[in-house]
């Protein structure tokens, strides 16, 4: 017997009149007076379920088929036939229905066929992938991840797996989760009364990583073109629609490169993955366009056709000051652009994706290359219409003396970053990279307004269920 994904049947990959078995879950069951039941079966391979037409002459029709409810798992065997009804081209004329698993109590099943609020679905994150919306998010998320890997592979980049446990703070912000095996009720102390991390598992303080960038730099300074793609962690007490404590980052790093190199790389990558999702997950995007945000498809299509604008931070500040618009957060040189500023630039002024470059040094990280003016660093943010910042990057500081000075400005002892300084001591090169928050990318593509709804099991302040 041939087992077939629902997508293969509905897309016409399999011949009409061929016999197949589909395996999945019941979305709905509808019974006709003519003694026929219509089962809508989904397996997650595509957005739409397949309709199985079940006659009442099956041996288990009365005692099993008529008792099927939403969520029951089944194996249905039958012939592929052209569907006379509108909505899908093919359906299954069932000759056998095997019940694999029952829903214990249909009345209390959390995923009953009524539409649920997004907020409710967060409370049942282990069951929410069974819904149309979260199933579609999962397929789009997968498509984007595969497209990212494919893009970098085609561009000659090597994927590097950065460590999740680190002794370095890549952002210098200190908002990190500590990793420790010490007994919290009986902490060892030094003579000065501080916690003695020499007795901890690693013999020092360690944390969950906030970025794979510093490790990626080490490999870029040896094999030239690399990227990381993995989870990162921020102990930032932000309960907003844009923040997670655990999220995924895409971080390319390129040797012998400057800010312009990675600005072009960012544009090429975003256009590549958006073209991929438009081509490969059209059914899911049409659902998001219909139910979540009616600009999703048009926004992506316009994005891939747009030329990115570029503007210096200083010029962007002047644009914002002189635009005649009153912002909630006042505009002056030296501020970090707020979301309202970013979206005005992308949506109203440039009406296109825009790369803002050369930010004040005091609002950017220690590793960003100092510009000749001594006031700004070679940093960039990519701003997208509809969301604002989607990528942040920079040319890295390759000059050891300036890097050391910047570390001290941030209160970082250069000796604690000796391995990172070695990259400048031994064959230093100009290099650059950026970070893309993967959940923000998925949110942008799907139109889902909250990043908690585009990651399988969100981790946020005071919330770590499942």
UniProtKB/Swiss-Prot annotation:
Q: Name one Pfam family in it.
A: tRNA_anti-codon
Main subcellular localisation: cytoplasm
What does the UniProt keyword field contain?
Answer: Aminoacyl-tRNA synthetase, ATP-binding, Cytoplasm, Ligase, Nucleotide-binding, Protein biosynthesis
- Reaction catalysed? tRNA(Asn) + L-asparagine + ATP = L-asparaginyl-tRNA(Asn) + AMP + diphosphate + H(+)
User: Is Cytoplasm among this UniProt entry's keywords?
Assistant: yes
Q: List the disulfide bonds.
A: none
Record note on quaternary structure: Homodimer.
Subcellular localization is given as: Cytoplasm
One cellular component term (GO) for this entry is: cytoplasm
Query: HAMAP family, alphabetically?
Result: Asn_tRNA_synth
Any idea of its EC number? 6.1.1.22
Could you identify this protein by its name? Asparagine--tRNA ligase
Q: Which family does it belong to?
A: Belongs to the class-II aminoacyl-tRNA synthetase family.
Which GO terms of type biological process are on file?
asparaginyl-tRNA aminoacylation
Molecular function terms in GO for this entry? asparagine-tRNA ligase activity; ATP binding; nucleic acid binding
Gene3D superfamilies, from UniProt?
A: Bira Bifunctional Protein, Domain 2 (3.30.930.10), Nucleic acid-binding proteins (2.40.50.140)
Matches recorded under CDD domains: AsxRS_core (cd00776), EcAsnRS_like_N (cd04318)
Q: Which domain of life is it from?
A: Bacteria
């Amino acid at each position: 017997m041939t087992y077939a994904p629902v997508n293969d049947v509905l897309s016409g990959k399999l011949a009409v009149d061929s016999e197949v078995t589909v395996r999945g879950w019941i979305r709905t069951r509808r019974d006709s007076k003519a003694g026929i039941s219509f089962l809508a079966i989904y397996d997650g391979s595509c957005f739409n379920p397949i309709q199985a037409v079940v006659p009442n002459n099956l041996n288990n029709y009365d005692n099993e088929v008529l008792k099927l409810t939403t969520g029951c798992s089944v194996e249905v065997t039958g012939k592929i036939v052209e569907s006379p009804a509108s909505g899908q081209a093919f359906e299954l004329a069932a000759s056998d229905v095997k019940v694999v698993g029952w829903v214990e109590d249909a009345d209390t099943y959390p995923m009953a066929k009524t539409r649920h609020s997004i907020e409710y679905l967060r409370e049942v994150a282990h069951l929410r992938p069974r819904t149309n919306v979260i199933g579609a998010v999962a397929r789009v998320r997968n498509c984007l991840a595969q497209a990212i890997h494919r893009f970098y592979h085609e561009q000659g980049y090597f994927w590097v797996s950065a460590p999740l446990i680190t002794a370095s703070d890549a952002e210098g912000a200190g908002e990190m989760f500590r990793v420790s095996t010490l007994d919290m009720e009986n902490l060892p102390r030094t003579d000065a009364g501080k916690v003695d991390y020499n007795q901890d598992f690693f013999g020092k303080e360690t944390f969950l990583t906030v970025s794979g960038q510093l490790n990626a730099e080490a490999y870029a300074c040896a094999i030239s073109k690399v990227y990381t793609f993995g989870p990162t962690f921020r102990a930032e007490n932000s309960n907003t629609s844009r923040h997670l404590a655990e999220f995924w980052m895409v971080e390319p790093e390129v040797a012998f490169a400057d800010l312009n190199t990675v600005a072009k790389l960012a544009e090429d990558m975003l256009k590549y993955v958006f073209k991929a999702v438009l081509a490969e997950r059209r059914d899911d995007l049409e659902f998001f366009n219909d139910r979540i945000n009616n600009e999703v498809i048009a926004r992506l299509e316009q994005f891939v056709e747009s030329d990115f604008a570029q503007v210096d931070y200083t010029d962007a500040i002047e644009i914002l000051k002189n635009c005649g618009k009153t912002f909630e957060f006042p505009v002056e040189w030296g501020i970090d652009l707020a979301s309202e500023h970013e979206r005005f630039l992308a949506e109203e002024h440039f009406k296109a994706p825009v790369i803002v470059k050369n930010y004040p040094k005091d609002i950017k990280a220690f590793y960003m290359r100092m510009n000749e003016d001594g006031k700004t660093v070679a940093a960039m943010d990519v701003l997208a219409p509809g969301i604002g910042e989607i990528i942040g990057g920079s040319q890295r500081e390759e000059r050891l003396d300036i890097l050391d000075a910047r570390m001290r400005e941030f209160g970082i002892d250069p000796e604690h970053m000796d391995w990172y300084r070695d990259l400048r001591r031994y064959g230093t090169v100009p290099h650059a990279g950026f970070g893309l928050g993967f959940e923000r990318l998925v949110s942008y593509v799907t139109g889902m307004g909250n990043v908690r709804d585009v990651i399988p099991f969100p981790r946020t302040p005071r919330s770590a269920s499942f």
